[in-house]
């Protein structure tokens, strides 16, 4: 963690699952301060008490700032002395964003613009923004707002020297057991003896753990260049496979799985990299890096000289990546701290 020694890291939307995972990873390192910026004072108070109880010797490194990314004044007030930012604040529930799309725009697009503007003015050195696979070929309001967020990031990266402020972006698949995800719901349904509800058994989703989510952000922080999009080469599984794995872990009946149909704005499979992005992607082992297109608006000079031959990869989606079996999915789910705690109850 030497890159973070004595530095101040700000996490927007920091009381969520990602913020908690970062605190668990960083608090016992040589980092100077972790600043949690969010709008919910109750969640901040809960987080404060939780970490004072379980890590009293380092909990003083956590500082809290109440505000909303929609309000640039509150963002600027929280930005003083910040070295690095992980921008996780977002509206991310697909159905609710379908019914309130302008709210998704206010938080995910305009809120990101506010964070980046304030960060550049404050001289923040490195910003990693969290996006989603739903931003690739978006069909719903949440994905569309995140796609626009990515465009804001790329546009902002062109306006500032990377020596002053580096801005890059990560795309996630489904982060298992994060707030609002389906596995905690299934566990509760099993315990109450209710049917396990799933949308479509053939639907596929990328899956990753919270630790892997943090790993991706740290990889982007260290290896990404300004304007880049970085993704993990994540495996996937069908929703049926995931539901059966949870049933086996928690004693539910596979016969009690109820198909309720696809919700507003959902797709049968998700895409982490489009065809066009794959053509430019750089293979970095467990990750792909998609460089920013640095060309300006003066296209005349490009008419006489085309691109070099491109890669011929197809898009990277949850149907053509490694599909896990029930046993492999169960093993991955069982390794999560949340699941270990639930199984111990």
Could you say what each language-model-derived stretch is?
Residues 38, 65-66, 106, 200, ...:
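Conserved residues in the N-terminal Rossmann fold of short-chain dehydrogenase/reductase
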Residues 30-43:
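Conserved glycine-rich Rossmann-like NAD(P)H-binding loop of the short-chain dehydrogenase/reductase
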Residues 60-84:
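Conserved Rossmann-fold cofactor-binding substructure of NAD(P)-dependent oxidoreductases
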Residues 64, 104, 167-170:
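Hydrophobic/aromatic anchor residues within beta-strands of the central parallel beta-sheet
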């Amino acid at each position: 963690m030497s890159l973070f020694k004595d530095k101040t890291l700000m996490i927007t939307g920091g009381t969520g699952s990602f913020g908690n995972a970062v605190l668990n990873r960083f608090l016992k390192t040589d980092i100077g301060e972790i600043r949690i910026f969010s709008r919910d004072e109750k969640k901040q108070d809960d987080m404060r008490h939780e970490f004072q109880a379980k890590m009293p010797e380092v909990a003083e490194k956590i500082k809290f700032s109440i505000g909303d990314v929609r309000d640039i004044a509150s963002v600027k007030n929280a930005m003083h002395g910040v070295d690095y930012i992980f921008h996780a604040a977002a509206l991310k529930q697909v159905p609710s964003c379908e019914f309130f799309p302008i709210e998704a725009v206010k938080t995910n697009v305009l809120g990101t613009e506010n964070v980046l503007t304030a960060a550049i003015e404050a001289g923040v050195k490195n910003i990693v923004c969290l996006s989603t696979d739903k931003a690739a070929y978006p069909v719903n309001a949440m994905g569309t707002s995140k796609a626009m967020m990515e465009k804001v990031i790329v546009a902002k990266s062109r306006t500032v020297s990377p020596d002053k402020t580096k801005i890059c972006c990560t795309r996630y698949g489904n982060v298992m057991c994060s707030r609002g995800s389906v596995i905690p719901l299934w566990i509760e349904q099993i315990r109450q003896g209710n049917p396990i509800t799933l949308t479509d058994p053939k639907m596929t989703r990328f899956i990753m753990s919270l630790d892997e989510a943090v790993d991706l952000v740290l990889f982007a922080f260290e290896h990404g260049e300004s304007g880049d999009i970085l993704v993990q080469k994540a495996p996937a599984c069908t929703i049926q496979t995931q539901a059966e794995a949870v049933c086996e872990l928690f004693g539910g009946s596979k016969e009690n799985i109820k198909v309720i149909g696809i919700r507003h704005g959902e797709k049968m499979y998700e895409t982490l990299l489009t065809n066009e992005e794959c053509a430019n992607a750089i293979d970095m082992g467990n990750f792909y890096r998609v460089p920013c297109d640095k060309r300006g608006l003066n296209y005349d000079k490009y008419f006489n000289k085309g691109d070099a031959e491109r890669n011929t990869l197809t898009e990277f989606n949850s149907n053509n990546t490694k599909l896990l079996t029930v046993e492999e999915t169960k093993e991955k789910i069982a390794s999560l701290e949340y699941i270990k705690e639930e199984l111990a109850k």
